[in-house]
Amino acid sequence: MEFGEEIADKAIELGFEELELGFHTTLEQVKGFKARLDQIPVGSVHAFCPVPISAPQGYPELYQLASLDDDARAIARVHVKKNIEFAADMGADAVVLHAGRVMCRGFFSRWDLKRRVKRGQKLVAAFKRELEQMLPILEKNKVTLGLENLPYLEGFPAEWEVKDLVGDWVKPWLDTGHDFVRRVNQWIDEASKISAEDVRPQTLDLSPIGLHISDSQGGDDHLPPGEGRVDFPALKTFAENARHVVFEPAPNVREDALKKGVEHLKRTWAL
């Protein structure tokens, strides 16, 4: 296990200006990140971070705030609140959340978008009630909740659902690799998807607060930029309007590949 100081030092060496603490971050590593805050700040925290003592390992869907199960929501509520407070303590102003999944008996077929939309309606209502309870905590800590798009059909909220959930302290969080997987599988409702062309003053409330940058070939994600088929030029407007732009490569991505990905993005976005 790398120490927090080592990770922070490597990020500084690679030219990154801020960190996102991921869901694999341990309590021991947090000490190291705190020791480097004067050199590289923490901009965002990915729930659930640090790894809860009760959990065997980090996982972004240990708890699901978007659930029709009362007990599941109650447990998730406690941990999301802790993450909001932890983010504020680290000086971060955003918490990235995998909200939950729209469950059904069996699995959604690849083309079963209509059934997915219908089953999501109840979850939207339940999740909105949870968000209402979170708003005072978010506002008190000056932390925005970022709802990440997920790379599977049952992932919640979907593009057509997130617009009914956002507000001053709740915003979309766009994972570019996940977005590509969803597009390749034709899961995105063309009438309501958030596109670069939609980022106008009257719709900026739907502009993502942050981006997770990764590439994808369609059946995978978290590749370095330039190794997949994500249309990064089309995402430039999103990046310009986002508060946080976070590289999120897979753990097995080598340092030289990561550096090439950074350079690819700099050329693409003329940075």
Where in the sequence are the language-model features?
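Alpha-helix-loop-beta-strand connector modules within alpha/beta enzyme cores
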Residues: 36-51, 127-134, 138, 166, ...
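A cross-domain feature marking catalytic cores of carbohydrate-active enzymes
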Residues: 1, 21-25, 44-49, 97-99, ...
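Short acidic/polar active-site loop segments enriched in Thr and Asp
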Residues: 17, 93, 209, 243
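Aromatic/hydrophobic pocket-lining residues that form the small-molecule binding cavity
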Residues: 4, 76, 80, 127, ...
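N-terminal pre-domain/capping segments
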Residues: 1-82, 88, 142, 170-171, ...
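Active-site acidic/histidine proton-transfer and metal-coordination neighborhood
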Residues: 65-171
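Acidic/histidine-rich catalytic cores of soluble enzymes
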Residues: 19, 131-229
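Short amphipathic alpha-helices and their capping/turn segments at secondary-structure boundaries
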Residues: 23-43, 79-94, 159-165, 188-206, ...
